Each structure stands twice: as structure tokens, then as C-alpha cells.
Amino acid sequence: MTDILNKILTAKAQEVAAQKAAVNAEHIRALAAEAAPVRSFIGSIRGKHRLNLPAVIAEIKKASPSKGLIRPDFRPPEIARAYENAGAACLSVLTDEPYFQGSPEYLKQAREAVSLPVLRKDFIIDEYQVYQARAWGADAVLLIAAALEREQLERFEAVAHELGMTVLLELHDESELEKCRNLTTPLWGVNNRNLRTFEVSLDQTLSLLPALEGKTVVTESGITGKADVEFMQSRGVHTFLIGETFMRADDIEAEVGKLF
């Protein structure tokens, strides 16, 4: 595990402890049970595939640890509507505040503005956060294999599925496959950013494809335009999580539209 990931996870543990002190586990479960009905994240992706279209998970991201502030003019409802109008399948919204300048309010605002399903993009280290995600209105959660042990992955997935949510499992390399082998989610993402060097290469996804036969594979990071999309589709990958390319565009709707 890298130093930056360790730092993020240490801070996240402190954050979750404070959140539990403010809203206890019983209360967050009750809020999750009362949340708006789940929108099918995996269903929306499969709907695009049935139309022979790339399924784009479009990300709402203000900043990142490596790039700093990405989009100063940051209005989640407007961004969400641009994504929906352009044909995105789903949204991904950063809720981590210390490192990505995210917020649960951004997730709520984005979901209220559109009919698309929404992923909570964060560092999930406690099942409390899965209930929390549903309470905020999220339809899917990200589980990062590099950040979790086998037992945590299996438990958090079970909680998400009990709540009707989709799980996007994120891998970085083959070493993480073994601890994920009992997971049942159909949605397996590969982050093309090398955790050691932070270099981005689509080869990360390609190298894992043989091991992910039968899964709906999401390629994450490093997709910069239609040429990348068409290249990955030629290799059998039809689902794309894209953030920074869109966030830096003057006209987000037009930028997304270029992929179709």
C-alpha cells in the first residue's frame, strides 16, 4: 500500500469515528432504510450495452491529491444535468473532503438534479459508510481492494447488496484478485493509475482482462477521448469511468458527447 493511500485511510478512520459519534450506527441504518428508492446502477450500464453504446460513468470531482483543484467553477447540479443530457449511464460523485474537496451535499445535489443512478466515490473502510451512502441517496458504492481485507470486502458487499445497491469493486493489479474471489458483484473496475508510480496506462486494464472473463469491466483513469474508448471497446471493454477530462472542459456536455 502506498504512502498516500495510507495517509488517506488513516485520516478516513478518524473521520468515520467522528461521524459515528455524531450519528450512531442505529440511526444511520434507519436513515438508509428511509432513503429514496434505489436506481439500478448496473441496470443503467447494461442498458447502454444493449444499445451498443459505451457506458460512461461520469465523475463529479472538484480536486484530487495529485492535481489539486481541477474545476474552480464547480456546480454539481449543472454538471449532473450536462452529463445526463450528453448520454452518460451513471454518475460518480466524490464525497471525500480532505483530499478531493468532495462532500455528501454534492452527491445529494447531483442526484436530485437528474434521474441517473449515482455512485458514492470515497474510501470505504467501515460498513457504517455503506449505510451512510444509502442514507445520502447513493445507488452504488466503490470498494477499493487495495484498501481492504478479504473479510471487509465480503462484509461490505453483503451490506450494500442488502440495501439494493450496486458495488463497483476497484482493482489495481493481479495481486488483489485472490482476496476478491468470493465477491459476487458483476462490476469490476481496474484503475489504470499505478499505485506505486502514479503513472497512468491503459495496459493496467488490458493485463487484467483474462482474469475478469464474465465480469462487466470498468476501465478507470486515463481515458482522454474517443480514440481511447474505441481502442478499449475493440478489446472488449465497454464501460468507462471518466472524470478529469470532463471536469477540465469548458463545455462538459459537448465533451461527453464526443465519445458517442
UniProtKB/Swiss-Prot annotation:
PROSITE patterns: IGPS (PS00614). It comes from the Bacteria. It is an enzyme of class 4 (lyase). It catalyses: 1-(2-carboxyphenylamino)-1-deoxy-D-ribulose 5-phosphate + H(+) = (1S,2R)-1-C-(indol-3-yl)glycerol 3-phosphate + CO2 + H2O. Keywords: Amino-acid biosynthesis, Aromatic amino acid biosynthesis, Decarboxylase, Lyase, Tryptophan biosynthesis. Its EC number is 4.1.1.48. GO terms for biological process: L-tryptophan biosynthetic process. InterPro entries: Aldolase_TIM, Indole-3-glycerol_P_synth, Indole-3-glycerol_P_synth_dom, Indole-3-GlycerolPSynthase_CS, RibuloseP-bd_barrel. Pathway: Amino-acid biosynthesis; L-tryptophan biosynthesis; L-tryptophan from chorismate: step 4/5. Belongs to the TrpC family. NCBIfam families: PRK00278.1-6 (NF001373), PRK00278.2-4 (NF001377). This is Indole-3-glycerol phosphate synthase. It comes from Neisseria meningitidis serogroup A / serotype 4A (strain DSM 15465 / Z2491).
